[in-house]
Amino acid sequence: MKDLRMVFKSRMNNIHFVGIGGSGMSGIAEVLHNLNYSVSGSDISQNKITDRLEKMGCQIYHKHHQDNIKNAQVIVVSSAIKDNNLEVIKAHQLNIPVVPRAEMLAELMRFRFGIAIAGTHGKTTTTSIITHILNVAELDPTYIIGGILNSSGINAKLGESDYLIAEADESDASFLHLQPMLSVITNIDYDHMVTYDNDYQNLKDAFIKFSANLPFYGACIMCADDEGVNEILNSIHRPLITYGFNNGTDIQAVNVKQVGMQMYFDVIYDKYTKQIPIKLNLIGKHNILNTLAAIGICCELNIKTNIIQKALANFSGVARRLDHHGKLNINNAQVSLFDDYAHHPKEISAVFESLKNTYQDKRLVVIFQPHRYSRTRDLFDDFVYTLSSADILILLNIYPAQEKPIAHINSSTLANAIRRSSGLNPMVIKNPKEILTVLPSIVNNNDILLILGAGDIHILPDLLKSNYI
């Protein structure tokens, strides 16, 4: 195995990332840098991630140019990078290999005990919980996560052990490059359908192929409560462990209750001689499901139950996953501020349910930025139904994520549809900074203010706190 690593390093020591500023790309880049590869990258955006990589010693360019790759032996591209990118064109001219992010991740995983977490929703939180438990168990894993761990402030780390924990991204089907030892499938939902020719069966088939990449002695941990997962269970031909709230699952959560910002429940698993009480430092039934998946992985690694319990009780979460930013003082109104990455109707519904169960007597004021024209079009009716359950709704313009506009698909159209189907009267604003002038006339004392979306709406919490605390 060491000989194979040396061959790879001798031939591919200089690695250049096009689009290095994303969480997935930066995580792989950081691990490779810490393995003493020469890492460079380009990204038109400067952010905390690129600043961190630069401080570590990576060469970062904030403009795409063919000269950026003059020393590169391999080019790694994110799914957002198109074939007409100047650096990609030059690489092809020079016969420099151009590989997708997941193929480089697969190469890292090939030399380790890989644990890959797949699913339309919940990947980042599940990956983070598994990582946290292994850290508490002093197993020192390598991890690459699509979000920032609140406990450490980072999304990737090179560990000393053979364990590598990573998210498996189905959005471009690149997760099929991965060959882990253990895997999780949290759910299968209608999203990124352009990749799958708008055919839901193609999406399900991809998850079946993903599970087939496991060795015959591996295991796939799957959420049997999810309809999409249930539909492929009989097509999985690897050792299988199911989890959920329903009877008949291998790992089952029972006796669920919420106290403040924590969830309490018991776990039934035939590997345990008795029910195991869990205190989870997160809210929401969706996070209980994420936790059950993590427990399934950790049982396969023979981590003791007392360590799992301890880790879950002090897990501090992931950035932009129901982040609580304290209270804002807006015209003497005390408003609790939450921020979440949710951008799919089912994710939004889970966040709404969690907050409404926690703050049953308070209004939910929601600021949402739709993400991608195609997703807004494909899930339009679901967005209308889900967003209509907010008490107050403010919509930002759709964040395009490099997509071209689609006729009649915009936030105003979405707002009009919500007005027709409910008593809600959404407000549409063009610029996130306009929120500062809008909020004082909207919020009441003790409202819950929720920021939602995967685009540049992430700037809002700091903007609001700098003006209203």
UniProtKB/Swiss-Prot annotation:
EC numbers listed for it are 6.3.2.8
Domain of life of the organism in this record? Answer: Bacteria
A Pfam family name for this chain?
Mur_ligase
Q: Name one GO biological process term.
A: cell wall organization
Cited Gene3D superfamilies? Mur ligase, C-terminal domain, Mur-like, catalytic domain, NAD(P)-binding Rossmann-like Domain
Write down the top EC class of this protein: ligase
**What protein am I looking at?**
UDP-N-acetylmuramate--L-alanine ligase
Native species of this protein?
Ruthia magnifica subsp. Calyptogena magnifica
Whichever gene encodes this chain, its name is murC
